[in-house]
């Protein structure tokens, strides 16, 4: 059995301060859980490739799904370049199947758009795809990467979602899909990039209780976590053959755990999202987002 022995946390950042006052709250998770009579919160997360959302928000999705809320992951590309030996439509088909299996394991929806991997550009066409996705999902919370990253697809995903963020409420644009009556809350995944400015964690939440669910979701992306990414790191021979052993191996990889930043710990303690002892003992942070705040944002 996988264990999050050193503590696992969500860290999030608000791209626009005006939303911060709408979302921050100091209620405990147990108090939030008691509010299950509320309509489901609708969350949509965007990534550049199948598996990006899983890494960035797998714990988030697990927590919301457990509350009966609605979560959808969207990959802007089909991932048809992310493998050392498979390519094109064969790989795209495989990665879509892996994404659907990952969503099934967690009880969320997963969609893979048919844009080419490594060739994503911030075009009007893709922006309108994102506007449609947000509107059709009737999203209240939208999550995306910051527009600074080593990978152009990641950067442009952040730019595209940012460019769509206001347009989702403009009725005269993308008229084939009804505009939202109010703007969702937009949030960034956590990251470790320091330029042009380091990531600021506005909310940090423990995901110890759903860490195994996140790893089980990542495990569905066989082409990535057991083939492509180990190959790029020169570690392919280290991947265990036994399915149970390789899942355990995956849970211990740096891609699944990140050293907790001091300022993230400060954010966690300041907002009192978890018990004091949990805060003090947490040594690791997830490449994750948040949960909890959607309930508070709803007026």
What is each stretch, according to the model?
Residues 1-16:
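N-terminal secretory signal peptides that target proteins for export/translocation
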Residues 133-179:
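Active-site adenylate/phosphate-handling loop in enzymes that bind or generate adenylated species
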């Amino acid at each position: 059995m996988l264990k999050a022995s050193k503590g696992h946390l969500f860290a999030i950042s608000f791209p626009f301060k005006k939303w911060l006052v709408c979302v921050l709250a100091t209620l405990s998770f147990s108090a939030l859980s008691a509010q299950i009579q509320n309509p489901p919160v609708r969350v949509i997360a965007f990534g550049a490739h199948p598996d990006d959302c899983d890494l960035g928000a797998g714990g988030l999705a697990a927590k919301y799904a457990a509350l009966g809320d609605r979560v959808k992951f969207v990959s802007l590309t089909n991932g048809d370049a992310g493998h050392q030996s498979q390519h094109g439509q064969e790989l795209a088909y495989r990665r879509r199947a892996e994404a659907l299996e990952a969503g099934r394991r967690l009880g969320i929806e997963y969609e893979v758009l048919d844009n080419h991997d490594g060739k994503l550009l911030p075009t009007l066409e893709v922006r309108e795809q994102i506007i449609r996705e947000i509107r059709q999902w009737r999203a209240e919370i939208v999550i995306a990467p910051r527009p600074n990253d080593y990978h152009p697809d990641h950067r442009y995903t952040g730019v595209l979602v940012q460019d769509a963020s206001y347009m989702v409420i403009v009725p005269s644009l993308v008229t084939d899909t009804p505009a939202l009556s109010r703007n969702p809350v937009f949030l960034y995944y956590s990251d470790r990039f320091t330029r042009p400015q380091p990531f600021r964690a506005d909310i940090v939440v423990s995901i110890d209780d759903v860490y195994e669910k996140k790893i089980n979701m990542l495990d569905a992306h066989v082409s990535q976590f057991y083939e492509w990414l180990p190959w790029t790191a020169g570690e392919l021979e280290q991947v265990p053959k036994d399915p149970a052993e390789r899942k355990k191996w995956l849970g211990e990889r740096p891609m699944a755990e990140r050293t907790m930043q001091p300022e993230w710990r400060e954010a966690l303690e300041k907002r009192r999202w978890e018990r004091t002892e949990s805060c003090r003992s947490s040594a690791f942070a997830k490449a994750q987002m948040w949960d909890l705040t959607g309930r508070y944002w709803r007026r």
